[in-house]
Amino acid sequence: MLTEEIKEYIGTQLKALTSIASPTGFTKNATDYLMKQLEAMGYAPQLSNKGNVSVEIGGVGAPLVLAAHVDTLGAMVRSIKDNGRLRPTTIGGHQWSTADGENCMVFTRDGRMYTGVVLNTEPSAHVADEKVEIKEENMEILLDENVNDKQGVAALGIQTGDIIAMDPRTVITESGYIKSRFLDDKLSAAILLGVAHAVKEEGWKINRKVTLLFTVYEEVGHGGSFVPADTEEMISVDMGCVGADLGCTEHMVSICAKDSGGPYNYELVTELSNLAKSEGLDYAIDVYPHYGSDVEATLHSGYDIRHGLI
């Protein structure tokens, strides 16, 4: 049973995870946090060479992997412009239209962090004759530093390849609504931490072997490319979609039947929908035409598993 204590725990973990900048390729701080949290619960998590965190939380037989990712969309410094602004390149499927005017952070390789703002190259309606199209080549990072040339930026230690992360702006309202960047997929990661917490603290019983997997390259397509060899089923726990002709709302369990990688395992989707129905959960089975998940990377790596996405 999902108690108020577990809900509060999940909310606390969500705030902690979103406060850690982790665009794909820059996830060590996030995985260090996961390792410490799981170890503090009494588990023995493992960190792969790639950076994924996995942990067995109990049960015997019919091994199941539940996967969530802690890497996020973001950007990288592509070059330093003559005017001291940074030209970015996207990490993952980042949409610049959602970031124009957003506060951001730039992380250098020697451990420094600078704040700035994402702007298009002609942000002022009082100056520009025409609107600038919001696309990558028209975006730049204006640092909160008194620099106006390449040399000034270089003196800060900023260089090509440095990571750019957007302000998460996480808010959990009194009515229980969550507003934040990077709910894809840090909310799912927080939920899986909540499951691990409930097993230890509230005695949740597990009737099969369950491994939680926190991946770090989902946003670029290969996060779930390695899982325990005995895995029989794997379910990606990722963001649900709302919109267009989909049946799901923000208040429902979302079960994906098909995405850009094709159909999910028919029998597993059926079992998930039957389980939701038997437990009285409000749910929808939907098709996501422009979606991909960790478990598809697992299949492409040659694993013989049944796969699902919720």
Language model: regions and residue ranges:
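N-terminal hydrophobic/helix-forming segments and targeting peptides
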Residues: M1-L309
